[in-house]
Amino acid sequence: MGNRRLALLIFVLFFLTGFTNLSAQSPTIEPSEKQLSTGEPFIYKIEPDAKGGEAYKLVYLVPVPIEVLWRFKTDFHGDFLETNKYIKNQRVIREKQNVVIIENRLSSRLGSKFRWRNILFSNKYRLDFVLENPEQCDQKFHYGHFQLEPLGAHTKVSHVAYFDFFGASLWAYYPWEGGMYAFLDYIARWEQETILKVKDDYE
């Protein structure tokens, strides 16, 4: 048996016996400015929704001003989106005032079309999102928000999400590629790198 397979078996056994039943952090948990300045993403498992499931908070620093990052994050038509390895394709279904409905296909579930309602609060640099068709995506619910805050000439991003689906807890604790931590680490680093390539379009 290979080392990776053995480690996975041990992890699953620990998971099934309650080894990973660790206390979740408060949603208000934050890294310090000094920690953020390293450029590293900070990932926290936070208290879940009262209905159950799992939740996370991802906090990271992006090296552009807040207005530039806000335009970038709310550009749902951008070609750059499909450079993200987890997004196969995306299209905008409807836009009305501060609400944008998008549909995308993810590499992890090519057979499902995820339809997201995004509510933009431009004066607060906040974007709320909710999965409108959870049953079609084998989920019970999935919602959260992005909050941007200026930090000098850079922007602090706080990404919070609450979700539930079969295997959600296993995904949340899985420590390798394919688990929550690897996914969120990639998302943050992809955004940090991608905005630098296209920022001239949003200045």
What are these regions (language model features)?
Residues 1-9:
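Bacterial N-terminal signal peptides that target proteins for export
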